[in-house]
């Protein structure tokens, strides 16, 4: 499946970093926030952008997967679509840092 999109993901990641550095930096920022346990949905496909992060703490066991912060049920749906995994994977490709 990987080769369906590109033969070398590292080359694609480098191209993004060179051509759209602000996009790569934003992805890395979001991934860093996720690693801290702070969730902020700002990617255009997730939901209406959120401006206040919800902080569950850095331990994954502390995440409340049924939380509805600010009374917004769309937040719950966005959280459980696990798009955070996409941002973590992209940050890893951009940086090579295994903590993602």
Predicted regions and their residues:
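Extracellular glycan-targeting catalytic surfaces
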Residues: 1-100
């Amino acid at each position: 499946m990987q080769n369906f999109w590109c033969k070398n993901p590292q080359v694609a990641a480098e191209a993004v970093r060179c051509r759209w550095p602000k996009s790569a930096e934003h992805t890395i920022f979001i991934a860093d926030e996720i690693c801290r346990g702070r969730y902020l949905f700002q990617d255009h496909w997730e939901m209406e952008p959120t401006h206040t992060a919800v902080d569950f703490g850095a331990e994954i066991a502390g995440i409340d997967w049924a939380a509805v912060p600010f009374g917004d049920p769309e937040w719950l749906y966005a959280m459980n679509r696990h798009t955070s995994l996409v941002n973590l994977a992209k940050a890893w490709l951009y940086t090579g840092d295994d903590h993602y």
